[in-house]
Amino acid sequence: MNTILAQQIANEGGVEAWMMAQQHKSLLRFLTCGSVDDGKSTLIGRLLHDTLQIYEDQLSSLHNDSKRHGTQGEKLDLALLVDGLQAEREQGITIDVAYRYFSTEKRKFIIADTPGHEQYTRNMATGASTCDLAILLIDARKGVLDQTRRHSFISTLLGIKHLVVAINKMDLVDYREETFARIREDYLTFAEQLPGDLDIRFVPLSALEGDNVAAQSANMRWYSGPTLLEVLETVDIQRAVDRQPMRFPVQYVNRPNLDFRGYAGTLASGSVKVGERIKVLPSGVESSVARIVTFDGDKEEACAGEAITLVLNDDIDISRGDLLLAANETLAPARHAAIDVVWMAEQPLAPGQSYDVKLAGKKTRARIEAIRYQIDINNLTQRDVESLPLNGIGLVEMTFDEPLALDIYQQNPVTGGLIFIDRLSNVTVGAGMVRELDERGATPPVEYSAFELELNALVRRHFPHWDARDLLGDKHGAA
């Protein structure tokens, strides 16, 4: 058994007490990225090893694997803890996104180890989409490379505000302070071009030797800052979704019997309370919250990130893909938008093409109208292109087949992020982040026939309990 885990359970007074303590720890999701062979997998292996998260049988297996596939001579190849695919071990690289979990006394962590090779940039974007922080590894011998810039830009494009620049392999440059200072200055010069208000920190370390990973290095006394683990344990993650208005995408209509009808999903942003008035988009019909049902029982209030089922006081038409928000909120459905796209398919993205797009449970069709520009990752300049190639990043104008309730991605990743799906193969071919909502996206006023208006008036007069909307709105009242 993992000795540190056994000790923690004993200190907490049993398994149940330990599990309760784990539930109240904050969770940090982070990814490691950078150029190929910068030591990302080795760093994660070092974190797991030095925080005593490796079981005895895993350690024994690691000794054997290091002899067969290792790249560190007689030393343990800690990268093998993460590189699980046979092709990864044979080539000594990371191909797929590998997820690992560990915890300390202060915090819980979920790590995404992403590929460094350019042809796997799409995998890196997938790993970054759910993370709060990015560790950008830089080989102290090579400095800032193109792939470092690419991963930095993708991370910030996907809404990550906290960047930890880990300058690795300091042991191979004799732990020289001037090397660290030069790379730090080079990266800060590049970072001036990155979008958003970023929190950037620098840590010199050696993942292979363990310097400044979980313990202070005796070889770099010139560095007085925190270790990498201390940064991860103490960084204050302010999630934008906590401060945004309530958004609840319906993922599933829960109807186990005739007496229960609920709408299941994860609260994307804001909070919702029992009794609160809500509005359904795109229909615009209003109701109020009767119950908030969870696995652990009913609640009076739910916050962003919680998986809940909402029961409403009225039987109204709601289906998968609809969006619930506060009744006093205004969110005009849009048919036109400018989307930041990370393209993931061999066939380039070009104007005139149509794809299925999926947004928070809603699936519809979209047409590519124009490509405004592609980003040159080397210098973050914009260039005109006729198509967007594999791993290309650019700003694209799109038109949806139907109006969609969208937010700007930087404000709400759930209702502002979408994926492109090939209509023939059903393969995901791209990821998109809403940058702008076109003013043409507002739904135009609907012209109703005389029959529709008369029928609406009849229903409201004789069936007021149906809560039918007045089609004439303010004009009717004024008349």
From Swiss-Prot:
Organism field: Salmonella schwarzengrund (strain CVM19633)
Instruction: Kindly state which keywords UniProt assigns to this record, in alphabetical order.
Output: ATP-binding, GTP-binding, Nucleotide-binding, Nucleotidyltransferase, Transferase
Residue ranges of domain tr-type G in the record = 25-239
Q: Does the keyword Kinase apply?
A: no
Region (G3) residue ranges read 113-116
For the region G5, what residue ranges are annotated? 206-208
Q: Extract the PANTHER family matched here.
A: TRANSLATION FACTOR
Task: Please state which protein family the record places this protein in.
Answer: Belongs to the TRAFAC class translation factor GTPase superfamily. Classic translation factor GTPase family. CysN/NodQ subfamily.
Q: Does the keyword Zinc apply?
A: no
Region: G1; residue ranges are 34-41
What gene, per UniProt, encodes this protein?
Answer: cysN
Full protein name: Sulfate adenylyltransferase subunit 1
| E.C. designation(s) | 2.7.7.4
Q: Which InterPro entries match?
A: CysN_GTP-bd, CysN_II, CysN_NoDQ_III, G_TR_CS, GTP-eEF1A_C, P-loop_NTPase, Small_GTP-bd, SO4_adenylTrfase_lsu
Biochemical pathway: Sulfur metabolism; hydrogen sulfide biosynthesis; sulfite from sulfate: step 1/3
Q: Which domain of life is it from?
A: Bacteria
**Residue ranges of region G4?**
168-171
